């Protein structure tokens, strides 16, 4: 049986954490900041943890990472 291929699009967007979770950049951060409050912009900095209901599915895409 052939090896599973890593989904390259997912590999560029998500990183595995030491505890087995997945983290990614926040959405809504590329443009249109004039419509967002200062608090919203501040909270969108950094990374976000993926919800546990989706982690199992995305780990299959990231099988070799």
Curated annotation (Swiss-Prot):
Transmembrane segments: none annotated. Gene3D superfamilies: 4.10.410.60. Keywords: Ribonucleoprotein, Ribosomal protein. GO terms for molecular function: structural constituent of ribosome. Coiled coil: none annotated. GO terms for cellular component: cytosolic large ribosomal subunit. InterPro entries: Ribosomal_bL35, Ribosomal_bL35-like, Ribosomal_bL35_CS, Ribosomal_bL35_sf. GO terms for biological process: translation. It holds the Pfam family Ribosomal_L35p. Residues 31-44 have a biased composition (Basic residues). The keyword Magnesium does not apply. It comes from the Bacteria. Residues 1-51 are annotated as: Disordered. Belongs to the bacterial ribosomal protein bL35 family. This is Large ribosomal subunit protein bL35.
């Amino acid at each position: 049986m052939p090896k599973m291929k890593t989904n390259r699009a997912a590999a560029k967007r998500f990183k595995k954490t030491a505890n087995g979770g997945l983290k990614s950049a926040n959405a809504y951060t590329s443009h249109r900041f004039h419509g967002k409050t200062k608090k919203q912009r501040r909270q969108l900095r950094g990374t976000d943890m993926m919800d546990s209901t989706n982690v199992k599915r995305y780990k299959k895409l990231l099988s070799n990472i």
